[in-house]
């Protein structure tokens, strides 16, 4: 409404002072060559712009209200008031009564006006208010979500504790604990087994704790809990067998691979695993305290600090290797027991078959002693010995051959007679 009142008043004044304005327009045209250069795309100032400018200065005094500036801009058709002045001082003065938006924009928009600037300011203000309102709502929603999450976490924590209490009070809990401990004991080094026993000694405290939590609370569904406990015990039992298989097979393969690496390093470097750097035992005794102190202080300056030293197994690794060997030995005995027994019997049978009875060998030895100078029985002697001993001719021949080999150098008469016989044949 204020805009319309100013606009009508200015139009009436314009009609009354038309002649005076024509004279002023002529003066302005004469001054245009001396004014600063304007953009060619902008329209030149008109008499209406000049009239409005003069009326704003004369009627509204300081001319600082945004509504008057908006009215002048609307009538001017979007032309910038800065281009209507002839000096920089006039331009700076005109900027004093322009609206903040118009002064900032410089009126350079082709179809912009003061009224549109006021509308845009109102829209920006409303937008900011709506953003602040929506931001506060988001903060409230976040707080509510955080509270809900905290409540859900507390409920879930209580449910977990309640489930643990029901499991501890179940009849199959002892079997479940035993199966779990059995899995732990399989690959645990021997020197660390007391830690498991110490934890088992404290199990009563844990049972008492959860028993207190479970008092006054309804138990879980017996069917679901029974099914869970049964399946979990079976699962741990199956897992125990898998761990045993892993220790017997895969762990032993790892131990053998490590041993092969040690042998390869020994062949390349010539230093056996476990050998020192040439220091004597007395030097080791002197440096023992210093090495212990450095280890406790966190120093890692030793030869094995970065894993580049000799591959010396630790005590836990030795115990694990010994356990693996015992397991494999027991497994081999159980799997190949029958074959081992058969092989042993076969060896003994062959030994018995190759060894002659004592009474028969005494007869052969008697003949050997009586014919020590020439221990070569004739065919008649062999046939008689076959009858006396009951042996085969092949066995008698083999016995005399072996006997001559055993006593070849112990009987000098035999060797000398053999040599003389050989010379006579030549």
Swiss-Prot record:
Skewed-composition ranges (Gly residues): 104-114
Pfam families named among the record's database cross-references: ELK, Homeobox_KN, KNOX1, KNOX2
Protein name, per record: Homeobox protein knotted-1-like LET12
SUPFAM superfamilies xrefs: Homeodomain-like (SSF46689)
GO MF entries: DNA binding
Record function comment: May have a role to play in formative events in ovule and embryo morphogenesis.
InterPro entries, alphabetized: ELK_dom (IPR005539), HD (IPR001356), Homeodomain-like_sf (IPR009057), KN_HD (IPR008422), KNOX1 (IPR005540), KNOX2 (IPR005541), TALE_homeobox (IPR050224)
GO cellular component: a single term: nucleus
DNA-binding region(s) from the entry: 348-411
CDD domains assigned: homeodomain
UniProt subcellular location: Nucleus
PROSITE patterns reported for this sequence: ELK, HOMEOBOX_1, HOMEOBOX_2
Comp. bias regions, Low complexity: 15-24, 139-151, 413-426
Domain ELK: 327-347
This protein's UniProt keywords: DNA-binding, Homeobox, Nucleus
Gene: LET12
Family designation: Belongs to the TALE/KNOX homeobox family.
Top-level lineage group: Eukaryota
Protein species of origin: Solanum lycopersicum (Tomato)
């Amino acid at each position: 409404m204020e805009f319309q009142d100013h606009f009508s008043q200015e139009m009436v004044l314009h009609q009354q002072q038309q002649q005076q304005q024509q004279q002023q327009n002529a003066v302005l045209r004469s001054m245009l060559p001396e004014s600063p250069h304007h953009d060619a795309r902008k329209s030149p100032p008109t008499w209406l712009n000049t009239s409005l400018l003069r009326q704003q200065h004369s009627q509204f005094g300081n001319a600082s209200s945004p509504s008057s500036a908006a009215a002048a801009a609307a009538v001017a058709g979007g032309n910038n008031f800065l281009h209507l002045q002839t000096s920089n001082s006039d331009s700076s003065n005109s900027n004093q009564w322009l609206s903040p938006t118009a002064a900032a924009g410089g009126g350079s928009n082709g179809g912009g006006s003061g009224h549109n600037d006021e509308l845009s300011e109102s829209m920006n203000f409303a937008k900011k208010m709506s953003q602040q309102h929506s931001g506060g709502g988001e903060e409230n929603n976040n707080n509510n979500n955080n509270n809900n999450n905290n409540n859900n976490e507390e409920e879930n924590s209580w449910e977990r504790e309640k489930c643990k209490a029901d499991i501890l009070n179940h009849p199959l809990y002892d079997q479940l604990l035993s199966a779990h401990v059995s899995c732990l004991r399989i690959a645990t080094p021997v020197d660390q087994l007391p830690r498991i026993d110490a934890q088992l000694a404290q199990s009563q405290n844990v049972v008492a704790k959860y028993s207190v939590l479970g008092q006054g609370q309804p138990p879980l569904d017996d069917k679901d809990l029974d099914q869970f406990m049964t399946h979990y015990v079976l699962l741990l039992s199956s897992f125990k067998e898998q761990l045993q298989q892993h220790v017997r097979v895969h762990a032993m393969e790892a131990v053998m691979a490590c041993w092969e690496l040690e042998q390869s390093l020994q062949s390349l470097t010539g230093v056996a695993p476990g050998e020192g750097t040439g220091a004597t035992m007395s030097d080791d005794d002197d440096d023992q305290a210093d090495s212990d102190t450095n280890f406790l202080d966190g120093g890692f300056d030793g030869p094995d600090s970065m894993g580049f030293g000799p591959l010396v197994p630790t005590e836990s690794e030795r115990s694990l290797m010994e356990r693996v060997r015992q397991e494999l030995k027991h497994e081999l005995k159980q799997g190949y027991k029958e074959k081992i027994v058969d092989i042993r019997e076969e060896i003994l049978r062959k030994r018995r078959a190759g060894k002659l009875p004592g009474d028969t060998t005494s007869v052969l030895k008697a003949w050997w002693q009586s014919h020590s100078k020439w221990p070569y029985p004739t065919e008649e002697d062999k046939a008689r010995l076959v009858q006396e001993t009951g042996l085969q001719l092949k066995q008698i021949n083999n016995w005399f051959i072996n006997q001559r080999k055993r006593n070849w150098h112990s009987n000098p008469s035999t060797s000398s007679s053999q040599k003389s016989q050989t010379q006579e044949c030549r």
